[in-house]
Amino acid sequence: MLFLLYAEDRDLLPVNSDGYDDYALRPKRLEVGDRMGRGDAFSVTASQIWGRIADLSRIVDRGDASIGIPPYNGGLFAPANTPLLDQIRLPDSVLAPVIDKLSFERQGSDRRYINYRDLTVQQLGSIYERLLEHEVVREDGVIAVRPNAFARKNSGSYYTPDELVTLILEKTLEP
């Protein structure tokens, strides 16, 4: 979800296109924030927010020329890489607070919209690296998130600091 928020806030997705509005997360984030601010209840059975996230993930993975999105095919949103997500549907009562916390920073009674545009690639990589240290599992019919010390090792996912990349490039490409 962080990558979708980042892509929208950086205008990497066609957020200014009317055709994209029906699938975008930004309007849903604002709507959820307004409703949370008013103390509205969210359904414990309906999964509209989940549906929006699932639809957008599928569109980004496969592309949809009718709304101006090419297939990205990076594998991040490929259903084969996230089989658990196809087996569940989180209700709005669960996802609304998550969307709200990812979208608004609170300082006392003030709420400030979080714009992911300002994240650097390094910060996004660092967040992703930390997320890789956890795994989502189903335990006795309940979905849980738990630390997994071997998750990054098993997936071969390691973040390489800029300084090391620069050094390797300089030494490798020297005449």
What are these regions (language model features)?
Residues 1-175:
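Preference for the N-terminal adenyl/adenosyl cofactor-binding alpha/beta module
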